[in-house]
Structures are given as structure tokens and as C-alpha cells.
Amino acid sequence: MKAAVRSVKNFSKGYTDTQIKVRNATTNDSWGPSGTAMAEIAELTYDQNEMLEVMDIIDRRLNDKGKNWRHVFKSLSLLEYCLHNGSENVVRWAKDNIYIITTLREFVYVDDNGHDQGQNVRTKAKEITSLLEDEHALKEARGDSRERDRDRDRTRSSRFDDDDDDRAPYEESRLSRAPSRASRYDDDDRDHRSRRRSRSRRPGRSRSRRRSRRPSPSAEHNSAEENDPELQRVIEESKRQAEEDAKRRNMANDSEAELQKAIQLSKEEDEARQRHQREREQQEQAFMGNQQNAYQPVDFFGNPVQPQPTGFLQQQPTGFIRPQNTGFVQPQYTGFVQPQHTGFVQPQATGFMQPQRTGFVQPQATGFVQPQATGFVQPQATGFMQPQRTGFVQPQATGFMQPQRTGFVQPQATGFMQPQRTGFVQPQATGFIQPQRTGFVQPQQNGFFNPQPTGYMQPQRTGMMQPQRTGFSQPFESNNPFPVMQPQRTGFGQTPNAPMMAPNHTGYVHPQPTGLQRQTTGYTGNNNPYSRPLQSQSTGILQQQQQQSAPRLEPTKTGSNNPFAQFSNLPSQSTAPATKPMKPVRTGDDRFSNIAQAISTGNPMGTDSFGNIGLTRVPTQHTGSKFTNSAGQTIQAQATGNTHNPFQSQQATGYYKQPMQQQQNMQQPYYNQQNYNYQNQQPMQGMQQQSMQPQVGSLIDL
């Protein structure tokens, strides 16, 4: 039944005779393949086409399922036989597909009875793997198989020859006796020979030719190589690989040539770019050289002038920038003007005020900054340097701000002088005004200060301070450089009509009717040019009074020469005691009569015990009074009546606290007949003076 099914399947699948023989040798029957069938298949392997058909069926059987373990085992047995007796192509195929055989060493199958049927398969796979891995054992096995085949063929041929010799006489007698029987034996022998001949002829070669080829191994190897498709495929693959390598080398050579060509082109481009850059630089240098030659500054004799090392950016008429001569823009190619061609003023030729020639107060020359020249810088001794107590040491060198323009500082609200009104602080000698160095602002035609060799401003023609704009007055014959500020009732709507003073009167304003209303001023006779307290003021709309005239020069009890007393702490009090004239102090020593006379008269130019005059006299921290020659009572600071004054603060350090009294107007005219003859009139807006309580003291007594 199985044979019939197999025959139908062979026919339906279209298997060839060689494939059918291999399938019959590897059936699933319980018996193994016969030796004759395996020998015939081994003979077929010498033909290349039939060898491929044999190996194809063996490969399928080796990869069959586990239940068909007999297919696998019989295929391994047939392969082992072909390795011993087949062609060399079988050996090469087995080595190329050794992984299939190696995998079968792990073959496992257990049947329904619990028997491991894969044991035989694993054993056979291990034997074939060992044979393929051992080349020497494989050669010996194949050699032994050839010897056995030769012996078998020799034995068979000799047997056939002996049979023929023994049969000849018998055949002759027999043929003579029974011709029919002899012809029958001949027919049988011919059939037998024809079968053998056909069997040997099917592989495509005769046994005789195989025998003649076997003794020569080299010839057999050569013929096997010629008929081996794998070898041919390998050879073809090698040729193809060689061709690919040659092409790759050619491509590499081509790419190398292209790379060299690209490198050469890059070099040429780089050289061309550098050449163009050099040409452009040469052209620029030539153009710049022409420009430089065209605009090269020269002196009076035609020699080229080098640019001055100034902090200004140099400029030439060219708009090209040369970055190599400056850290920023090159001078000869910048768009900036060089110092010799620029409109900028050179520092040595500028019209601006030089520091050594300016009319401003030099810090090193002033008596207020240097403590060793004056004693007024110490804050504990004077309140002079404090902002709330000054009001008169303002930038005296200005004079740009005109009093008529500032209407925001009310006289009753502040006791400070406007900065444009000052100009009386002499820096080089004392903190007070030196008559021979006027220090007043000259009324020039322009609004600038001309630097004079003296360093002070000349008061000839100033157009800054207009006299008709001030509401303050000064007697014509008064030599007081600081005019008294008259308290007044301000009557708005009044038209000022004050003429301008002559240049020899230092630009100060004569008492003229102004739009501001004034009250009668009482003078205290104080010699201090700064301490001029104001009387209480009252404002009235559209009222006018005549100004009070010239003060008297007489010593009083309040004859203190301290210029800082009126700037001490101001409480809000309104009582003012009447001032009394002060009698001269008698020291009983005629040796110091001049000092006593100077102290008693309140002369600020009197000398002290050390020979100092004016502001250089010893201040109050070294004596009992404000100055060593300031005899009499000191002036008590009075309240201004305005508690919102931002400059009112505590009393300056170095002074003892004194009780505050009523605010009063003080005026101290001063006139020196021996050395100076000048008249000063200075309008002061909002200056409120304060008086201190009298304190009797004398340098001689101390």
C-alpha cells in the first residue's frame, strides 16, 4: 500500500529516476537501504547533474519532522556511504552544509511507547561530523573504499572469464547436441551482459573508463574540479571579486585624481584670491598715499606736521578710516578733524578760563579751606563751613544769576544770601575782603569773566547784576562792602526806578525807591560786616516808604567782629532788647593801648597779641570771645520768625549755647581812611541777621 502511494506521489511530483531511487532508499520502512541501492546512488554522484539531484533529496530528508526519524537516519546512512564511495563533490557539499549535520546531534524524538528514537540519529550525526572534521581519516576511508571496489571488480571480472572458459567446450558439445539449449544460454548471457552494460552506462561513463581514471588521483582531481559546480561558482565568485576589486581600485584612483584636481583648483583659487587682495591693498595704499599727500598738514616753512597727541579724535578731510594709527579710528583716514585742522580749541589756545588764570576762588588760596591760614575751617569752632549757617560763602565767582530773575527766595523766609551777590571771599590772604583786592565782579560787556593777573573780577561794566532790580539800599557815603538789608513791606506793582552806579562804586545799588516797601532800619553800630540782623518785617500790598540813610560808626555792646554769630541756632522768639553803646575797656597797661583801642572801637583791622590783623586773628576757641580783640558783648542769635527755614539747625560745635533773643537789624559800616577808599553796595535778598547776647571780654583780660 505504501509502495503504491509512493509511486503515485513520485509521478505526481515529477521526480526523476535518480530522485526516485534516493526516495526509495530513504523510505519510512522499518528496514534500511540495501547495499546495491546505495552503491548505485554512489555511482550516480560522479555525474554532476545527478549528484545535485541526489543531494537535493538527501537535504530534504535530513530536515524532515521528528516523527519521520527513519527518513533522517537513512539519509545520514546514505550520505556516509556516498562520502566513502561517492565523488569529491559529495565531500565538498557535506563540508559546506556541515551545520545541518551538526544540528542533528541534538535530535530528540520519543515515540508512543516511550522509546527515544533519536539516539541513532544523534550517534550517526556525530560520526559524520567527526569524519568531515578529520581530513586524514576521510582520505583513508575513501582510499579503503576504492581498494575494495577494485578488488570486487577484479574478482567479478575473473569470475566472468573463468565461467567463459569452462563453458566453451561444454557449449560446443551441447550446441552440437542441443542447438536450441545452447542458444538459450547465449541469450541469457547476453541479457545478463546487457543489463550490466546498461547499468554501467546510465551514469554516463563505463566502468572501464572509471577504472582507467581511478589509478591517477591527479587526473581524477582535475576532472572533479572541472565538473564541480561549487568550485566553478567559487571560481566565478573569485573572478567577480577580483573584477570588483579592480574596479574599486580604478575608482579609488579616479577619486584620488579628482581629489588632486580639487586640491589643485583650491590652491589656484587661493592664489588668485591672495593676488586680488594684494592688488586691492596696493590700490588702497596708493589712494591713501595720494590722499595723505594731498591733505598732509605742514607748518609755515612747508615741513609736514605730525598730529598732536590730544584726547580728541583727529580728523582729516578724507572720509577713509585708517585703523592702524589709533586705538579706535586712524587719524589720517578718519572723518574726524585733526587738532591742527579742527574747530576744537587747543587747551593752550582755548578761550576758556585756565585754572591758573581763572577768577574763581582757588581752593589752595582761600582762607576758608586751609586750616593753617585761617581758623575758620574747624567745624567745632565756627559754623562757617556748614551749609545752613553760611548763606554768604556761595560761588562768588558766578554772577550770572540776576536777582531780579529769582523771585522764589523770600527775604522773610531765609537768611541766606544769593550766590550771585557774593564775590567778596578773598582766597589768598584772609577769609574776609581785602580792600586792595577788590574781588568784586567787574561788569563787563560780556557775561564771562576775563582772567586777570590778579585773579579777581573787576567791577567796571558788569551787565549781570542790575541795580534797579534789587530791593535793597545803601547810603551813598557808606564804605560798608555789604549793604544792610532793610526789612520792608512788600508792595507789589511798584515800578523800580534806580539808576546804575558808576564803575568806581563796584556795581552796588544806591538806595532808590523800589517796588518793595521798607521800614526804618535801626543800626546797632556793629563792626562786623556780616552780622546785620533785620528788623521784623511786615508785608503790605501797594505800600511804599522811604529808605533810611547812612549808619553811624560807633562802638556798641554788640560790637563783635565774629562773622558767624548770626548763623547759630535760631529759635522762634520775637523779643529784641535795645542795644546800648559800649564803653572802651581800660586794661591799665599802655603797652597794649593800640590793641585795646582796636578792640574797643570794634575795628576789624586791628591787630591781636600775635600781630595778626583782620580775619587772621585768634578765634574764639582760643579766647573767651569771638576774636581776641573783639571786646564787649557778643551778639545773640535771634529767631527769624519762620520755622520752616531748612538751614536752621543746631548750634555749630565749638560754641557754647546762648539764650535766643528777639531778631533785630544790625548794620556795621566800616571805613578805613589809611589804606582803602571804596564804597560797596550789595543787594541781598532774604538775608536775615541774628544777634547774640552781649558778652564782656577782652584779650588783655584773658
Swiss-Prot record:
Its function? Answer: Binds to membranes enriched in phosphatidylinositol 3,5-bisphosphate (PtdIns(3,5)P2) and phosphatidylinositol 4,5-bisphosphate (PtdIns(4,5)P2). Required for endocytosis and localization of actin.
- Looking at the UniProt entry, the stretches that span the membrane are none
Pfam families xref list: DUF1720, ENTH
Q: Where is the composition biased (Basic and acidic residues)?
A: 136-160, 183-192, 230-248, 266-283
MF terms per GO, please?
Answer: clathrin binding; membrane bending activity; phosphatidylinositol-4,5-bisphosphate binding; phospholipid binding
Species annotation = Schizosaccharomyces pombe (strain 972 / ATCC 24843) (Fission yeast)
**What name does UniProt use for this protein?**
Epsin-1
Mind telling me which InterPro entries this protein's record contains?
A: DUF1720, ENTH, ENTH_VHS, UIM_dom
* Chief subcellular location: cytoplasm
Q: What is the effect of changing T103A?
A: Aberrant cell morphology and depolarization of F-actin
Instruction: Tell me where on the tree of life, at the top rank, the source sits.
Output: Eukaryota
Q: Mind giving the lineage of the organism this protein is from?
A: Eukaryota, Fungi, Dikarya, Ascomycota, Taphrinomycotina
Effect noted on mutating G86S: Aberrant cell morphology and depolarization of F-actin
